[in-house]
Each structure stands twice: as C-alpha cells, then as structure tokens.
Amino acid sequence: MSYIFTSESVSAGHPDKVCDQISDAVLDAYLTEDPNSRVACETMIKNNMVYIAGEITSTGSPDLEPIVRKTISDIGYDTDDYGFNGETCEFTNLVFEQSPDISQGVTEGEGENLEQGAGDQGLMFGYACTETDSLMPLPIDLSHRLVKKQADVMKEGGLSWLRPDAKSQVSAIYSDDGKTIEGLSAIVLSTQHDEDVTQDDIKEGVMEHIIKPIVPSEWILDSTKIYINPTGKFVIGGPVAVSYTHLRAHET
C-alpha cells in the first residue's frame, strides 16, 4: 500500500528564519575576528523590534547593530510598509561576556574535567538519498526550492506584489516499499503579498512564476491538490504577525 510523506520549508522572510539568520550573522561576525569564539546568541523579533541576547567569550568585538540591520534589509524587510524594516527597527543588544564559571567549564584545561571542551553534547544523524540531485528526499528538496524561488522572484521584481514571508509544503506519494515516487499528493505555497492584488492574480502568478519552474510536470497528477494562499489573504506577515526566538550557539 502506498503512503504519503510531507515536508515543509519556510522562506528567508519567515520570522523563524529571520531570527536564525540574525543569530548566524552575529556568530559569523565573532568567528571572523576570533575563530575560537564561543557564542550563544538568541534573537527575538516582534513588530518593528529586534532583541539579541546571549553570552560570548571572544577576543573579537564586532559592531553588531549594523550587522543585524543589514541582515534584515538584505532579506527584503527594507520598507516601513511591511511593519518591519532593517533601517528603522528598534534594536536592543543584550549580549554580554560569558560567565567565568561557565567559561572554565568549557575551556579545555580548566575546570574539574580538564579534557571537556564543550558545555553541551548532542547526537545528530542524517542520511543522503538518490531521489534528487541535492541528495535529499523529494518533499523537502521541492519545499526548499519553492521558497527559494519565491525569494528570488520577489527580489528580481518578477511579481511586484510579493513580500518576504512564505512557507511551502510538499506531499509525495511513495510506493509501499518506499523506493518509488508515484507523484505528488499536494503542494502548498503560502506567500505574503501586497494589499491591492487579487487572489486570482496571486494564484496565477505563483503557479506560473514559482511552482511550474520548480516542480517537474510529471510529478503533478490529475489528483494532485495545489493550494496557493489557502487562507485567502496573507498581507500581514513576518514578525508583525507572530513573534519568534532563535538560538545560535558555537563552542570550540
């Protein structure tokens, strides 16, 4: 018996991903100045406000505010019309030096366990497959590519009414042994948009400029359900719609 497997991806303008990119940018800034930096940076965004907080051990001292503002603007939040703007948002920096008590516990040669070099340990696993050129399963590969295409079309001006926040889901039908993809059960593409565009124009534009260039026609069956902005309206998005927090940590 065949089964359906679904994967989801969010665009660079989705608030969760915005927080991720800000924390990443802070980490990269410290590692550029000091490759041995230990960084725990958490980002929270809501409306036109950005907070970064965390503890850092580093000889570097990058100016974080312009880095954070540029990251937000580069994503596409560069106008007050979106309610979130990298140039005008309220920025609060609550990043401080790491506690010396914690620092000695994660510095090799210090603390009670002289060989311990990290304060947190974890096990991660993953695998590659041959379903796609990216070596990832088809549903997540297509989901990633759809939101990437949405961002590209927005930045290139192909659909002038697109805004940064977007999410996609792709459901693939697999044979009972999991070795053969029989087609797609459903495609969902929700994208933020300007107020003055009709739902018909949104559906046509997304289908022609985003979905068709990415999804091979042979995967779209007569039974495939395609949902484009199924709620009917997605004007309010990003951190104006929801608040998000994301942590980026690095230890050496």
Q: What are these model-derived regions, one by one?
A:
Residues 55-62, 232-244:
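Short glycine/threonine-rich loop-to-helix capping motif typified by GTGT followed
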Residues 39-42, 48-106:
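Glycine-rich, N-terminal phosphate-binding loop and its surrounding beta-alpha-beta segment
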Residues 6, 77, 85-239:
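Glycine-rich, mobile lid/loop segments that gate access to catalytic sites or pores
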